[in-house]
Amino acid sequence: MARLKRNRHWVALLCISLLVLFIGHAVAQQDQRGQTSYLKVDITEPFASIMARMSAAKPAIQKRQTDLLNERYDLADRPAQGATMSRGKPLQEGVRVKLPAGTTWDRLAALTPAQIRDQNLYPKGFFPLPHPNHPEGGMIFPHFAIDEIKKQEGRDLTRFDLDFDLPDHFLPEFPAALFLTTRPDLGDVSQGKLVTINNYYELFNGILNPKQLEGLRLLVTPFPQQQFNQTEDRRTATPSRGVACFDCHQNGNTNGAAHLVGDIRPQQFRHRIETTPLRGVNIQRLFGSQRALKTVEDFTEFEQRAAYFDGDPVIATKKGVNVLERGSQVHFMAEVQEILDFPPAPKLDLFGKLDPARATPAELRGQEIFFGKGQCASCHTPPFYTDNLMHNLETQRFFTPVMINDMMAVSDGPIKTFPLRGIKDTPPYMHDGRLLTLEDTVEFFNLILGGKLTAQEKQDLVAFMRAL
């Protein structure tokens, strides 16, 4: 009898254990999948209540992101001597990613990916960077961009729930220079102004043809977007006219505005995406960091129909999706994008390499590293320093998946090889802006690719990339 009771006891324990394992597996599966792919359309909470609730939560959300940035990076304003962007803004210099206590970059580079993972030594600044409020996401703009658009158009891109997170000195210069492949003789055609719906005509009438002028008008015209629209499901204090392409891609470059990619579910697996420049799209054959769209026309249409609304056509219908006409509007917009040129690089020859008569010894040494020991040219091939392919760096070799401010840090997957021409004008770096300086970028790829570069070689490599 006692033996029977003991057997029943063990059977009960076994059943409970199996149930716990089943529930845990089910929860894990749910965390990986999400409950639904769709966003909530029928908002029943009054807008005043939404705004009050999210505004009250804003300080704590901002503090959490600020604390994370300070934990990951040295955010001091330390401009490089003699190194500027096209219109004179100083580049930030130095490695800003903080190392784990007790190690050095050389010691870290000597370890295998498995050793770095098992000893938890992967630098926090190399992990994917979360959105300032990852569960909410959405477009978020630097304050200088908000101020200028509000000044010119009276249109306010301020979000009541969130502010931009990265300091201004790590962002591209504003307004950016604007160069045209069709009129290289004119140099910067922006006249030092931010191109908007209020001034595009006076700036470009007589320089662009009528088709291009209409394309530019569409690029600076705001259309409804997920956070910026006229419904109660918005993140602006008053109904918004929306967002224009050039609100993020200012003057055809970038202002560093951030968003979440719309092609991933659930929310915690979505990647932060930093706005990429439109310069040089004429030589590119892939568009979108991971989507591999094949033409500028495809991407232009995709932005309006999908990216503006987190990849959800249901909610896009509610908020006022702008369906572009492919045969005219899309082509007009694409033609303008395809004549946006890279900035001048006076030290490069016709093949995209350094002219020895113009380059410094450090730049020439850096070029040798770029094409040799550093393995950079395996993907970034001249003259524009892209192979127009996608590559998976398999960064997950170096760390165990972890939740960071409600973002699940896992593998990045295959990412487009972005051109390096004019790279000094477009910080921060990587698709999510996790690397603040070129020095950070060199340390990242030295570790990921196992280059084992010396300190001097790293400095020379930075000097070369500044000349591109």
Label each region the model flagged:
Residues 12-22:
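Bacterial N-terminal signal peptides
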Residues 26-468:
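Periplasmic c-type cytochrome electron-transfer domains
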Residues 9-11, 106:
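Short linear interaction motif-like sites in intrinsically disordered regions of transcription factors
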Residues 1-7:
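N-terminal secretory signal peptides that target proteins for export/translocation
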